[in-house]
Amino acid sequence: MSEFEEKLNESSYGADSIKVLKGLEAVRKRPGMYIGDVGDGSGLHHMIYEVVDNAIDEALAGYCDLVRVVLNKNGSVTVSDNGRGIPVEIHEEEGISAAEVIMTQLHAGGKFDQNSYKVSGGLHGVGVSVVNALSDWLELRIWRNNTEHLIRFNNGITEAPLAVVKENVDKKGTEVTFFPSVETFTNIEFDFSIIEHRLRELAFLNSGVKILLTDNRFEEVKEVEFYYTGGIEAYVKYLDRAKHAVHSCIVVNADNTESGISLELAMHWNDSYHENILCFTNNIRQRDGGTHLSAFKSGLTRVITAYLENTGLNKKAKNAFSGEDTREGICCVLSVKVPDPKFSSQTKDKLVSSEVRPIVENAVYTKVLEWFEEHPADAKLIINKIMEAANAREAARKARELTRRKSVLEVSNLPGKLADCHAKDPAVSELFIVEGDSAGGTAKQGRDSKIQAILPLRGKILNVERARFDKMLGSDQIGTLITALGTGVDNREFSLEKLRYHKVIIMTDADVDGSHIRTLLLTFFYRHMPELINKGYLYIAQPPLYKVKKGASELYLKNEQALQDYLVKSAISDATLTLDNKEQLTNENLEELMSKVIKFNSLLDHASKKFNRSITEILAINDLLNNKIFDNESDSRLKKALNALNSLEQSPDKTDWEVLKHENKIEFFRFSRGLKERKILLREQLESFEFINISKLALTIFDVFNKQLKLVVKNQEFDILTPSILLNTIIECGKKGISVQRFKGLGEMNSDQLWDTTLDPKKRTLMQVRVAEVDEAEGIFSTLMGDVVEPRRQFIQSNALNVVNLDV
């Protein structure tokens, strides 16, 4: 008998464990109070978290080690676990099953009974009954006492009492399937990445619990497994995967038996200049920290002070350190378990339980100081980093003082390049940050000077991810930007009230250079002015890369992808693709095929740097870009593929391609003007990231390209053999009667064009910059802009499928 089964048999978790605090109608009247914002998606996803949290509470109690979350095709969600199963007996006070009580009564559940759960997420979430209240329908299945039970609800109202649907079932657990209310939520489409982030978080925090996330909504099923045995130490390493750690991880575990409060802490310093501290109470993230965070900070400062004094290193310090200096480059996950946690609001973003503070502070001080004394070499590296931070802070202070003295002597302290607007009200004022004087000149001519200011930045923009604060202040471009915004910079000086524009718009060219400059500016704002992002003041302009003209009509297109889409759609409207002289694809069906063909061709372009493009394509569409090519059963298909390849590449100077099979490689060869041309395909190449993805995508169009294809566009007929030929033919047909102009930069547009496409508030498109998950954003900026190469390579590989056209 397993540990979980023994606990299940011993459990006293029954109907009498359920305590009731009544009322459910209020949830439907004011859903935002109970589930979060019903308009921005946070409340919608919290519906899943409420059900998952119940399963995790079972795991915390030691009764569950598997949780499944499935996004179903019909838009519903299923959450299941292998815990004890919700109690099914009749509740003495209510006269209905305990399961129905839990689902229909507010504040009903085992969390109110200390014998059922020692710790849980607290009372502010108010439980799964809220999910029921805010669902069009909900279905609850319970496996308990070798019996399967079922109960259904419509808009929170019970259809029929809990019923037994199957007996003699060797299974335990709970399964909840719900469809969110279309009347309550503005949008009921779940975001896979948001759910993935939260479930990964929970898997790290609950070592040994396996969480499976499956998305069945699309043709290609997506499944991710989260299972970590390293706990929060593994979490810290995951968060810091794009940085160099200064030392091995410090791990602190502490239990206070009197209060029932326990602490798990993992942290290390890295070579960056930014702190990243994640705080959790009973698995729930506190974005605004609280008593556990303030306790950690004060405890850590005490540790550094004591260690410096004990070792005499304080005498070597040029400058006194601050609390911020001690946390420069720190990555920390702090998780506390509290029997009765108190939060500042229902969103649980800040812990206010005062009893947590002394326990956390004392544990941090005692255990971390002990670690320092046991690891003197690592401690010295940490102390050196803190002293460097203190010195840099002092240098930055002197640089700011010098800047202030200069500004006092100037008539105006606004930068000379800034073409300011006439409006003095920040709420209506806009600042466009543009690259170079050329684009700046055009923008100044085309703008509405009443409300639009233009700031051209000339020269190389500093990558602040790799620069200390004092070096950043020495950058002309960054200094100009800080002065123009008026807020100051860093925690001591920054004031959002002094911001001169409530729309700060990054406007760069629509090419790869513009993207790089935009990323550098986004890095600066994220690292040093995150308040602008949090308040929704930062935007990205969407200038066009192309202008297409057809007859008298003109259209501006944002990028290469938009141009290709336009040309393809132009041709598709008059196109028919016939398969084996029978089935015909037109309009939506042809458009769906072309979207796959475009993606397929993009992957081929990437892979062509490693192997011949034509051979790769012909093998892929014959399902041979895999280990099947080595099987004798595939010889006939390989011969057919070679015949197709040779018909495409006929040349009087070249012989046909031939093939030789070896144990771990395939050799393709032909003679060109007497010289042998060889292409070697290794078995290990077939197992590479690029080829696996090409092969997967090829299977989705296999049925089409295994037939004889004829394309007709406006009475013109074309024989089609491969996806590349289909795409190129469609694009060429789409170009007929159309002139295309490519803008190399914003400076190539005249002022009227720039106004019409990018500046005019009535016509333009702006992208507002938002941060959904801070630690995910932290990881992305560290990966893309940091010093470590390997995580960046992995990021590019894993996201290559999402790139259709790469402008290089």
From Swiss-Prot:
Query: Can you state the subunit structure given in the record?
Result: Heterotetramer, composed of two GyrA and two GyrB chains. In the heterotetramer, GyrA contains the active site tyrosine that forms a transient covalent intermediate with DNA, while GyrB binds cofactors and catalyzes ATP hydrolysis.
Q: Does the keyword Cell wall biogenesis/degradation apply?
A: no
Gene Ontology molecular function terms on file = ATP binding; DNA binding; DNA topoisomerase type II (double strand cut, ATP-hydrolyzing) activity; metal ion binding
Q: What is this protein called?
A: DNA gyrase subunit B
Q: What role does this protein play?
A: A type II topoisomerase that negatively supercoils closed circular double-stranded (ds) DNA in an ATP-dependent manner to modulate DNA topology and maintain chromosomes in an underwound state. Negative supercoiling favors strand separation, and DNA replication, transcription, recombination and repair, all of which involve strand separation. Also able to catalyze the interconversion of other topological isomers of dsDNA rings, including catenanes and knotted rings. Type II topoisomerases break and join 2 DNA strands simultaneously in an ATP-dependent manner.
User: Catalysed reaction(s)?
Assistant: ATP-dependent breakage, passage and rejoining of double-stranded DNA
> What NCBIfam families has UniProt attached to this entry?
gyrB, PRK05644.1, PRK14939.1
Q: Where is this site: Interaction with DNA?
A: 460, 463
A Pfam family annotated for this chain is: HATPase_c
UniProt xrefs under InterPro entries: DNA_gyrase_B_C, GyrB, GyrB_hook, HATPase_C_sf, Ribosomal_Su5_D2-typ_SF, Ribsml_uS5_D2-typ_fold_subgr, Topo_IIA, Topo_IIA-like_dom_sf
Q: Name one GO biological process term.
A: DNA-templated DNA replication
Q: Tell me which HAMAP family the record gives.
A: GyrB
Task: Give the highest taxon in the source lineage.
Answer: Bacteria
